[in-house]
Amino acid sequence: MESQQLHQNPHSLHGSAAASVTSKEVPSNQDPLAVSASNLPEFDRDSTKVNSQQETTPGTSAVPENHHHVSPQPASVPPPQNGQYQQHGMMTPNKAMASNWAHYQQPSMMTCSHYQTSPAYYQPDPHYPLPQYIPPLSTSSPDPIDSQNQHSEVPQAKTKVRNNVLPPHTLTSEENFSTWVKFYIRFLKNSNLGDIIPNDQGEIKRQMTYEEHAYIYNTFQAFAPFHLLPTWVKQILEINYADILTVLCKSVSKMQTNNQELKDWIALANLEYDGSTSADTFEITVSTIIQRLKENNINVSDRLACQLILKGLSGDFKYLRNQYRTKTNMKLSQLFAEIQLIYDENKIMNLNKPSQYKQHSEYKNVSRTSPNTTNTKVTSRNYHRTNSSKPRAAKAHNIATSSKFSRVNNDHINESTVSSQYLSDDNELSLRPATERI
Protein backbone atom coordinates (compact mmCIF):
# COMPACT_ATOMS: atom_id res chain seq x y z
CA MET A 1 0.00 0.00 0.00
CA GLU A 2 2.77 2.39 0.86
CA SER A 3 4.56 1.73 -2.43
CA GLN A 4 1.37 2.45 -4.37
CA GLN A 5 0.95 5.79 -2.62
CA LEU A 6 4.53 6.65 -3.41
CA HIS A 7 4.02 5.92 -7.07
CA GLN A 8 0.79 7.90 -7.17
CA ASN A 9 2.30 10.95 -5.52
CA PRO A 10 5.96 11.12 -6.46
CA HIS A 11 6.27 14.83 -5.61
CA SER A 12 5.70 14.14 -1.92
CA LEU A 13 8.28 11.41 -1.88
CA HIS A 14 10.97 13.28 -0.02
CA GLY A 15 8.63 14.24 2.80
CA SER A 16 7.26 10.71 3.14
CA ALA A 17 10.70 9.22 3.07
CA ALA A 18 11.85 11.56 5.76
CA ALA A 19 8.85 10.72 7.92
CA SER A 20 9.30 7.00 7.48
CA VAL A 21 12.97 7.20 8.30
CA THR A 22 12.39 9.12 11.48
CA SER A 23 9.44 6.99 12.62
CA LYS A 24 11.05 3.60 12.11
CA GLU A 25 13.85 2.23 14.17
CA VAL A 26 17.12 2.49 12.32
CA PRO A 27 20.30 0.85 13.51
CA SER A 28 23.02 3.23 14.62
CA ASN A 29 25.49 2.00 11.99
CA GLN A 30 23.09 2.48 9.03
CA ASP A 31 23.11 5.59 6.85
CA PRO A 32 19.68 7.23 7.10
CA LEU A 33 19.95 8.32 3.40
CA ALA A 34 20.80 4.83 2.14
CA VAL A 35 17.44 4.24 0.50
CA SER A 36 16.95 1.56 -2.10
CA ALA A 37 17.16 2.71 -5.69
CA SER A 38 13.79 1.10 -6.41
CA ASN A 39 12.15 3.48 -3.95
CA LEU A 40 13.59 6.57 -5.65
CA PRO A 41 11.71 8.40 -8.41
CA GLU A 42 12.86 8.31 -11.97
CA PHE A 43 14.65 11.68 -11.97
CA ASP A 44 16.50 10.76 -8.75
CA ARG A 45 17.70 7.54 -10.34
CA ASP A 46 18.86 9.50 -13.37
CA SER A 47 20.77 11.96 -11.22
CA THR A 48 22.31 9.08 -9.30
CA LYS A 49 23.37 7.50 -12.56
CA VAL A 50 24.94 10.74 -13.71
CA ASN A 51 26.81 11.20 -10.45
CA SER A 52 28.10 7.65 -10.48
CA GLN A 53 29.13 8.00 -14.10
CA GLN A 54 31.01 11.21 -13.33
CA GLU A 55 32.84 9.55 -10.46
CA THR A 56 33.80 6.36 -12.25
CA THR A 57 34.40 7.48 -15.83
CA PRO A 58 37.31 9.88 -16.47
CA GLY A 59 36.48 12.80 -18.72
CA THR A 60 38.12 13.21 -22.11
CA SER A 61 38.24 16.44 -24.03
CA ALA A 62 40.18 17.82 -26.91
CA VAL A 63 40.37 21.22 -25.22
CA PRO A 64 43.26 21.97 -22.80
CA GLU A 65 42.31 22.60 -19.23
CA ASN A 66 41.80 26.16 -18.13
CA HIS A 67 39.99 27.92 -15.33
CA HIS A 68 36.97 28.52 -17.57
CA HIS A 69 36.62 25.04 -18.96
CA VAL A 70 34.80 22.04 -17.50
CA SER A 71 35.68 18.84 -19.31
CA PRO A 72 32.55 17.02 -20.50
CA GLN A 73 32.23 13.28 -20.21
CA PRO A 74 32.32 10.84 -23.15
CA ALA A 75 28.98 10.01 -24.66
CA SER A 76 27.67 6.58 -25.44
CA VAL A 77 26.41 7.58 -28.89
CA PRO A 78 26.76 5.45 -32.00
CA PRO A 79 29.65 6.24 -34.33
CA PRO A 80 28.95 8.86 -37.01
CA GLN A 81 27.31 7.67 -40.17
CA ASN A 82 27.96 8.96 -43.66
CA GLY A 83 25.53 11.62 -44.59
CA GLN A 84 24.56 15.19 -44.11
CA TYR A 85 25.49 16.53 -40.67
CA GLN A 86 24.34 13.37 -38.81
CA GLN A 87 21.22 12.89 -36.75
CA HIS A 88 22.16 13.53 -33.10
CA GLY A 89 21.91 16.97 -31.56
CA MET A 90 24.87 18.93 -30.30
CA MET A 91 23.12 21.73 -28.47
CA THR A 92 19.37 22.08 -28.29
CA PRO A 93 17.73 25.42 -27.52
CA ASN A 94 16.94 24.24 -23.97
CA LYS A 95 20.57 23.36 -23.36
CA ALA A 96 21.67 26.63 -24.84
CA MET A 97 19.31 28.38 -22.43
CA ALA A 98 20.66 26.31 -19.56
CA SER A 99 24.21 27.22 -20.49
CA ASN A 100 23.36 30.92 -20.50
CA TRP A 101 24.57 31.29 -24.07
CA ALA A 102 22.32 33.58 -26.07
CA HIS A 103 21.89 32.86 -29.74
CA TYR A 104 21.29 36.33 -31.15
CA GLN A 105 20.13 37.30 -27.65
CA GLN A 106 17.45 34.57 -27.60
CA PRO A 107 18.70 30.96 -27.38
CA SER A 108 15.21 29.64 -28.07
CA MET A 109 15.35 31.28 -31.51
CA MET A 110 18.04 28.88 -32.74
CA THR A 111 16.90 27.80 -36.17
CA CYS A 112 19.24 24.82 -36.37
CA SER A 113 18.07 21.28 -35.73
CA HIS A 114 19.70 18.57 -33.64
CA TYR A 115 23.22 17.80 -34.77
CA GLN A 116 25.67 15.10 -33.91
CA THR A 117 29.03 15.81 -32.37
CA SER A 118 32.05 13.92 -31.21
CA PRO A 119 31.73 12.00 -27.90
CA ALA A 120 34.63 14.04 -26.60
CA TYR A 121 32.48 17.17 -26.80
CA TYR A 122 28.96 16.04 -25.93
CA GLN A 123 27.17 14.35 -23.05
CA PRO A 124 23.82 13.06 -24.31
CA ASP A 125 22.18 12.77 -20.90
CA PRO A 126 19.36 15.34 -20.82
CA HIS A 127 20.11 16.25 -17.19
CA TYR A 128 23.81 16.84 -17.80
CA PRO A 129 24.51 20.53 -17.11
CA LEU A 130 26.61 22.35 -19.66
CA PRO A 131 29.46 24.51 -18.33
CA GLN A 132 28.68 28.16 -17.93
CA TYR A 133 31.56 30.23 -19.25
CA ILE A 134 30.74 32.89 -21.80
CA PRO A 135 28.08 35.45 -20.98
CA PRO A 136 25.31 36.13 -23.46
CA LEU A 137 26.20 37.94 -26.65
CA SER A 138 24.02 40.83 -25.54
CA THR A 139 25.58 43.31 -23.19
CA SER A 140 24.75 42.63 -19.57
CA SER A 141 22.73 45.21 -17.71
CA PRO A 142 24.97 47.89 -16.21
CA ASP A 143 25.33 48.44 -12.51
CA PRO A 144 22.63 50.61 -10.97
CA ILE A 145 23.69 54.22 -10.88
CA ASP A 146 22.07 57.42 -9.85
CA SER A 147 19.82 59.08 -12.37
CA GLN A 148 21.78 62.31 -11.96
CA ASN A 149 25.05 60.67 -13.03
CA GLN A 150 23.43 58.58 -15.74
CA HIS A 151 24.73 60.78 -18.54
CA SER A 152 28.06 61.66 -16.97
CA GLU A 153 29.26 58.24 -15.87
CA VAL A 154 29.32 55.34 -18.31
CA PRO A 155 30.39 51.91 -17.05
CA GLN A 156 33.29 50.45 -19.02
CA ALA A 157 32.98 46.78 -19.90
CA LYS A 158 36.08 44.62 -19.76
CA THR A 159 35.08 42.75 -22.91
CA LYS A 160 33.62 44.58 -25.85
CA VAL A 161 30.35 43.03 -26.89
CA ARG A 162 27.59 44.17 -29.18
CA ASN A 163 23.92 44.36 -28.44
CA ASN A 164 22.89 43.23 -31.91
CA VAL A 165 25.00 40.67 -33.75
CA LEU A 166 24.14 40.57 -37.42
CA PRO A 167 23.99 36.91 -38.50
CA PRO A 168 25.56 35.87 -41.80
CA HIS A 169 23.38 35.21 -44.79
CA THR A 170 22.63 31.63 -45.75
CA LEU A 171 24.96 30.00 -48.24
CA THR A 172 23.22 29.79 -51.61
CA SER A 173 25.78 28.06 -53.85
CA GLU A 174 29.12 26.31 -53.76
CA GLU A 175 30.77 29.10 -55.75
CA ASN A 176 29.82 31.69 -53.11
CA PHE A 177 31.41 29.83 -50.20
CA SER A 178 34.60 31.93 -50.23
CA THR A 179 32.48 35.07 -49.93
CA TRP A 180 30.11 33.58 -47.37
CA VAL A 181 32.90 32.45 -45.05
CA LYS A 182 34.15 36.05 -44.80
CA PHE A 183 30.78 37.11 -43.38
CA TYR A 184 30.74 34.09 -41.09
CA ILE A 185 34.19 34.90 -39.67
CA ARG A 186 33.10 38.50 -39.14
CA PHE A 187 30.01 37.20 -37.35
CA LEU A 188 32.18 35.11 -35.00
CA LYS A 189 34.43 38.09 -34.28
CA ASN A 190 31.41 40.20 -33.39
CA SER A 191 30.33 37.37 -31.06
CA ASN A 192 33.51 37.68 -28.95
CA LEU A 193 35.13 34.67 -30.62
CA GLY A 194 37.82 36.45 -32.61
CA ASP A 195 40.65 35.06 -30.49
CA ILE A 196 39.88 31.44 -31.45
CA ILE A 197 39.73 32.13 -35.20
CA PRO A 198 42.97 31.44 -37.09
CA ASN A 199 44.85 34.48 -38.34
CA ASP A 200 46.61 34.86 -41.69
CA GLN A 201 49.41 32.53 -40.53
CA GLY A 202 46.94 29.90 -39.29
CA GLU A 203 47.62 30.66 -35.61
CA ILE A 204 45.06 31.04 -32.82
CA LYS A 205 45.44 32.83 -29.49
CA ARG A 206 43.73 30.20 -27.35
CA GLN A 207 41.83 26.92 -27.51
CA MET A 208 38.06 27.08 -27.64
CA THR A 209 35.91 25.64 -24.90
CA TYR A 210 33.17 23.06 -25.28
CA GLU A 211 30.45 25.68 -25.29
CA GLU A 212 32.24 27.76 -27.91
CA HIS A 213 32.75 24.70 -30.06
CA ALA A 214 29.06 23.85 -29.80
CA TYR A 215 28.10 27.38 -30.75
CA ILE A 216 30.38 27.41 -33.82
CA TYR A 217 29.17 23.99 -34.89
CA ASN A 218 25.50 24.94 -34.64
CA THR A 219 25.81 28.28 -36.39
CA PHE A 220 27.97 26.86 -39.17
CA GLN A 221 25.38 24.24 -40.04
CA ALA A 222 22.49 26.64 -39.61
CA PHE A 223 23.78 28.95 -42.35
CA ALA A 224 25.77 26.53 -44.56
CA PRO A 225 23.71 23.62 -45.92
CA PHE A 226 25.80 20.53 -46.40
CA HIS A 227 24.88 19.98 -50.07
CA LEU A 228 26.08 23.51 -50.93
CA LEU A 229 29.53 23.14 -49.38
CA PRO A 230 32.61 22.84 -51.62
CA THR A 231 34.19 19.44 -52.09
CA TRP A 232 37.23 20.20 -49.95
CA VAL A 233 34.96 21.24 -47.05
CA LYS A 234 32.91 18.06 -47.34
CA GLN A 235 36.09 15.98 -47.25
CA ILE A 236 37.12 17.61 -43.96
CA LEU A 237 33.69 17.12 -42.39
CA GLU A 238 33.52 13.49 -43.52
CA ILE A 239 36.69 12.80 -41.53
CA ASN A 240 35.61 14.86 -38.51
CA TYR A 241 32.17 16.37 -38.86
CA ALA A 242 32.78 18.76 -35.94
CA ASP A 243 36.12 20.13 -37.15
CA ILE A 244 34.84 23.53 -38.21
CA LEU A 245 38.07 25.18 -37.06
CA THR A 246 40.07 23.37 -39.75
CA VAL A 247 37.57 24.56 -42.35
CA LEU A 248 38.02 28.14 -41.16
CA CYS A 249 41.82 27.80 -41.12
CA LYS A 250 41.94 26.58 -44.71
CA SER A 251 39.43 29.21 -45.74
CA VAL A 252 41.70 31.94 -44.39
CA SER A 253 44.63 30.42 -46.28
CA LYS A 254 42.61 30.38 -49.48
CA MET A 255 41.69 34.01 -48.91
CA GLN A 256 45.37 34.92 -48.85
CA THR A 257 45.88 32.96 -52.05
CA ASN A 258 42.99 34.75 -53.70
CA ASN A 259 44.41 38.10 -52.62
CA GLN A 260 47.75 37.15 -54.16
CA GLU A 261 46.02 36.18 -57.39
CA LEU A 262 44.37 39.57 -57.52
CA LYS A 263 47.69 41.31 -56.91
CA ASP A 264 49.33 39.26 -59.67
CA TRP A 265 46.61 40.14 -62.16
CA ILE A 266 46.94 43.83 -61.31
CA ALA A 267 50.73 43.68 -61.66
CA LEU A 268 50.47 41.88 -65.00
CA ALA A 269 47.95 44.37 -66.36
CA ASN A 270 50.08 47.37 -65.31
CA LEU A 271 53.45 46.22 -66.64
CA GLU A 272 55.78 49.02 -67.77
CA TYR A 273 59.26 48.82 -69.25
CA ASP A 274 61.47 51.58 -70.66
CA GLY A 275 64.91 50.01 -70.35
CA SER A 276 65.73 51.54 -66.97
CA THR A 277 66.24 48.04 -65.58
CA SER A 278 67.89 45.09 -67.24
CA ALA A 279 65.91 42.98 -69.67
CA ASP A 280 66.75 39.87 -67.66
CA THR A 281 65.18 41.35 -64.53
CA PHE A 282 62.04 42.29 -66.44
CA GLU A 283 61.76 38.80 -67.91
CA ILE A 284 62.17 37.14 -64.50
CA THR A 285 59.50 39.38 -62.97
CA VAL A 286 56.94 38.63 -65.66
CA SER A 287 57.72 34.90 -65.71
CA THR A 288 57.35 34.67 -61.92
CA ILE A 289 53.89 36.27 -62.02
CA ILE A 290 52.72 33.97 -64.81
CA GLN A 291 54.09 30.89 -63.03
CA ARG A 292 52.39 31.84 -59.76
CA LEU A 293 49.07 32.21 -61.53
CA LYS A 294 49.60 28.87 -63.23
CA GLU A 295 50.11 27.18 -59.86
CA ASN A 296 46.68 28.49 -58.84
CA ASN A 297 45.10 26.90 -61.94
CA ILE A 298 45.07 30.17 -63.88
CA ASN A 299 46.74 29.80 -67.27
CA VAL A 300 47.91 32.94 -69.07
CA SER A 301 48.34 32.38 -72.80
CA ASP A 302 51.35 33.73 -74.70
CA ARG A 303 49.15 35.99 -76.78
CA LEU A 304 47.56 37.61 -73.72
CA ALA A 305 50.93 37.98 -71.99
CA CYS A 306 52.48 39.56 -75.11
CA GLN A 307 49.62 42.02 -75.44
CA LEU A 308 49.95 43.10 -71.81
CA ILE A 309 53.73 43.50 -72.15
CA LEU A 310 53.53 45.44 -75.44
CA LYS A 311 50.99 47.79 -73.88
CA GLY A 312 53.52 48.85 -71.26
CA LEU A 313 56.59 49.33 -73.51
CA SER A 314 57.95 52.84 -73.96
CA GLY A 315 61.03 54.63 -75.25
CA ASP A 316 63.12 52.69 -77.77
CA PHE A 317 60.99 49.59 -77.16
CA LYS A 318 57.75 51.18 -78.32
CA TYR A 319 58.28 50.30 -81.99
CA LEU A 320 57.77 46.62 -81.08
CA ARG A 321 54.06 47.37 -80.87
CA ASN A 322 53.85 47.94 -84.61
CA GLN A 323 55.98 44.88 -85.27
CA TYR A 324 53.69 42.58 -83.29
CA ARG A 325 50.43 44.28 -84.19
CA THR A 326 49.75 42.09 -87.21
CA LYS A 327 51.12 38.88 -85.73
CA THR A 328 48.57 36.27 -84.77
CA ASN A 329 50.94 33.66 -83.37
CA MET A 330 52.80 35.54 -80.65
CA LYS A 331 55.48 33.79 -78.64
CA LEU A 332 56.46 35.15 -75.27
CA SER A 333 60.03 33.88 -75.59
CA GLN A 334 60.44 35.66 -78.93
CA LEU A 335 59.21 38.94 -77.47
CA PHE A 336 61.66 38.66 -74.58
CA ALA A 337 64.46 38.05 -77.11
CA GLU A 338 63.51 41.22 -79.03
CA ILE A 339 63.49 43.25 -75.82
CA GLN A 340 66.87 41.82 -74.83
CA LEU A 341 68.35 42.72 -78.24
CA ILE A 342 67.22 46.34 -78.04
CA TYR A 343 68.48 46.62 -74.47
CA ASP A 344 71.94 45.32 -75.45
CA GLU A 345 72.18 47.73 -78.40
CA ASN A 346 71.28 50.69 -76.22
CA LYS A 347 73.78 49.59 -73.62
CA ILE A 348 76.60 49.46 -76.21
CA MET A 349 75.70 52.90 -77.54
CA ASN A 350 75.72 54.36 -74.05
CA LEU A 351 79.17 52.93 -73.43
CA ASN A 352 80.60 54.45 -76.65
CA LYS A 353 79.17 57.93 -76.14
CA PRO A 354 81.89 59.25 -73.73
CA SER A 355 84.81 58.20 -75.99
CA GLN A 356 83.22 59.77 -79.07
CA TYR A 357 82.69 63.00 -77.21
CA LYS A 358 86.31 62.99 -76.08
CA GLN A 359 87.64 62.55 -79.63
CA HIS A 360 85.39 65.31 -80.90
CA SER A 361 86.63 67.72 -78.25
CA GLU A 362 90.27 67.13 -79.25
CA TYR A 363 89.60 68.45 -82.79
CA LYS A 364 87.63 71.37 -81.42
CA ASN A 365 90.56 72.99 -79.68
CA VAL A 366 89.85 76.66 -80.03
CA SER A 367 90.64 78.76 -77.04
CA ARG A 368 91.82 82.23 -76.28
CA THR A 369 93.54 83.44 -73.19
CA SER A 370 94.10 87.06 -72.26
CA PRO A 371 96.85 87.70 -69.70
CA ASN A 372 96.65 90.48 -67.20
CA THR A 373 99.29 92.48 -69.04
CA THR A 374 98.12 95.22 -71.34
CA ASN A 375 101.02 95.06 -73.79
CA THR A 376 100.71 91.50 -75.10
CA LYS A 377 97.93 89.07 -76.11
CA VAL A 378 98.14 85.30 -76.45
CA THR A 379 95.98 83.56 -79.07
CA SER A 380 95.79 79.88 -79.90
CA ARG A 381 94.42 78.94 -83.32
CA ASN A 382 94.50 76.10 -85.84
CA TYR A 383 96.60 77.81 -88.49
CA HIS A 384 100.25 77.93 -89.59
CA ARG A 385 102.47 80.53 -87.91
CA THR A 386 103.82 83.12 -90.34
CA ASN A 387 106.91 85.29 -89.88
CA SER A 388 105.75 88.03 -92.18
CA SER A 389 106.81 91.48 -91.07
CA LYS A 390 105.21 93.44 -93.90
CA PRO A 391 103.09 96.43 -93.12
CA ARG A 392 99.39 95.98 -92.63
CA ALA A 393 98.47 97.58 -95.99
CA ALA A 394 100.82 95.31 -97.93
CA LYS A 395 99.42 92.23 -96.27
CA ALA A 396 95.88 93.23 -97.06
CA HIS A 397 96.82 93.97 -100.69
CA ASN A 398 98.44 90.58 -101.14
CA ILE A 399 95.42 88.73 -99.71
CA ALA A 400 92.93 90.65 -101.84
CA THR A 401 94.82 90.38 -105.19
CA SER A 402 96.16 86.85 -105.01
CA SER A 403 93.42 84.21 -105.18
CA LYS A 404 95.98 81.53 -105.76
CA PHE A 405 97.80 82.49 -102.61
CA SER A 406 94.50 82.40 -100.77
CA ARG A 407 93.66 78.88 -101.93
CA VAL A 408 97.16 77.59 -101.14
CA ASN A 409 97.11 79.36 -97.81
CA ASN A 410 93.72 77.82 -96.95
CA ASP A 411 94.96 74.32 -97.68
CA HIS A 412 98.07 74.99 -95.69
CA ILE A 413 96.08 76.32 -92.74
CA ASN A 414 93.89 73.21 -92.55
CA GLU A 415 96.96 70.99 -92.33
CA SER A 416 98.85 73.08 -89.83
CA THR A 417 99.33 72.35 -86.16
CA VAL A 418 98.50 74.46 -83.20
CA SER A 419 100.92 77.31 -82.73
CA SER A 420 101.19 80.50 -80.76
CA GLN A 421 101.99 83.95 -82.05
CA TYR A 422 102.87 86.94 -80.00
CA LEU A 423 101.59 90.15 -81.51
CA SER A 424 102.65 93.61 -80.54
CA ASP A 425 100.41 96.59 -80.30
CA ASP A 426 101.45 97.74 -83.79
CA ASN A 427 101.24 94.37 -85.54
CA GLU A 428 98.02 92.60 -84.54
CA LEU A 429 96.93 91.33 -87.96
CA SER A 430 96.82 87.53 -88.41
CA LEU A 431 96.08 85.42 -91.48
CA ARG A 432 92.90 83.37 -91.76
CA PRO A 433 91.09 81.51 -94.54
CA ALA A 434 89.13 84.70 -95.10
CA THR A 435 90.18 88.25 -94.42
CA GLU A 436 89.26 89.16 -90.91
CA ARG A 437 90.33 91.94 -88.67
CA ILE A 438 90.88 91.34 -84.98
UniProtKB/Swiss-Prot annotation:
GO cellular component: cytoplasm
Keywords tagged on the record: Cytoplasm, RNA-binding, Transposable element
Listed InterPro entries: TYA
GO biological process: viral translational frameshifting
Feature type site, description Cleavage: H397, N398
Main localization (coarse): cytoplasm
A Pfam family hit: TYA
Compositional bias segments (type: Polar residues): 1-11, 19-39, 49-60, 366-390
Top-level lineage group: Eukaryota
Region: Disordered, residue numbers: 1-89, 364-404, 416-438
Compartments, as annotated in UniProt: Cytoplasm
RNA-binding as annotated region, ranges: 295-397
UniProt GO molecular function: RNA binding
Subunit structure: Homotrimer.
Function of the protein: Capsid protein (CA) is the structural component of the virus-like particle (VLP), forming the shell that encapsulates the retrotransposons dimeric RNA genome. The particles are assembled from trimer-clustered units and there are holes in the capsid shells that allow for the diffusion of macromolecules. CA also has nucleocapsid-like chaperone activity, promoting primer tRNA(i)-Met annealing to the multipartite primer-binding site (PBS), dimerization of Ty2 RNA and initiation of reverse transcription.
The record's note on its domains: The C-terminal RNA-binding region of CA is sufficient for all its nucleocapsid-like chaperone activities.
Additional detail: Retrotransposons are mobile genetic entities that are able to replicate via an RNA intermediate and a reverse transcription step. In contrast to retroviruses, retrotransposons are non-infectious, lack an envelope and remain intracellular. Ty2 retrotransposons belong to the copia elements (pseudoviridae).
Name of the protein: Transposon Ty2-DR3 Gag polyprotein
Organism, as annotated: Saccharomyces cerevisiae (strain ATCC 204508 / S288c)
